[in-house]
Amino acid sequence: MTYDAVIFDVDGTLLDTSEGLISAVNYTIDVCGLTPLTESQLRTFIGPPIQNSLAKYYDLSPEKIQEIAEIFRDAYKEKFLLQAVPYEGIYTVLDKLVQNHIKVGIATYKREDYALQILEHFHFDKYATVMHGADNFNQMKKKDIIQLCVKEIGLTDPSRIIMVGDSDNDAIGAADAGMKFIGVTYGFGFASKEDVMQFENVGISKNTKDFFNILRQLDIIF
């Protein structure tokens, strides 16, 4: 099988964004007078749309959820967005993909304007042919964001594209888009190899060294 492109998730795949996201959630909970959450509950906010996470823990109307989501997003952008760390070795992986003429895309559930700001800050934009995030009102599914990337990359056969991510949203989005999937267990969603194996995949990576080996086995890099 020949592959032409690799599309990456952001939170838990390219960047460890836990510090900034958890700080922003705690800030929002405090400002809005909501019941505090445990550390393990707070970590579930990393990755999914903020509205989904709020609805999981608070019995509020959709309108109130959206109002709180906007407070969170404003706080995150203004105070906490850049509190993130690139995963060790990820730039080397991206360098190798570009050297092997593999197109790179980025598809994230982060709101698109925030996503572009953080990706440019950490210089991921120099690798990516295309970068897309979510809309303001949580209308887009991960598949929709992925398909935007595929369309702009200009490839017609999605089976020759690999999605890389740390969650079931990434795996399902890839399958719905007709793409292959590599799951990573160093992020926030998948905690183990067994978690990833619930979904069709062409590789499971516990770190970027593993990821290198998978790409070599798939003849994507040399």
Residue ranges of predicted features:
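Glycine-rich phosphate-binding loop signature in dinucleotide/nucleotide-binding domains
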Residues: 1, 99-102, 153-159, 218-222
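N-terminal helical cap/lid subdomain that shapes the substrate entry/recognition surface
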Residues: 3-91
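Conserved Lys-Pro-Asp/Glu-containing loop-to-beta segment of HAD-superfamily phosphomonoesterases
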Residues: 5, 142-171
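Substrate-recognition element of Asp-dependent hydrolases with the DxDx(T/V) motif
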Residues: 25, 90-119, 132
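Conserved H-loop
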Residues: 35, 125-129, 156, 205
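A short, structured active-site edge motif that brings together acidic residues
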Residues: 125-140
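Acidic, Mg2+-coordinating phosphoryl-transfer loop and its flanking beta/alpha structural elements
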Residues: 163-203
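Short acidic-hydrophobic, aromatic-tinged amphipathic segments that line or gate anion-handling sites
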Residues: 202-210
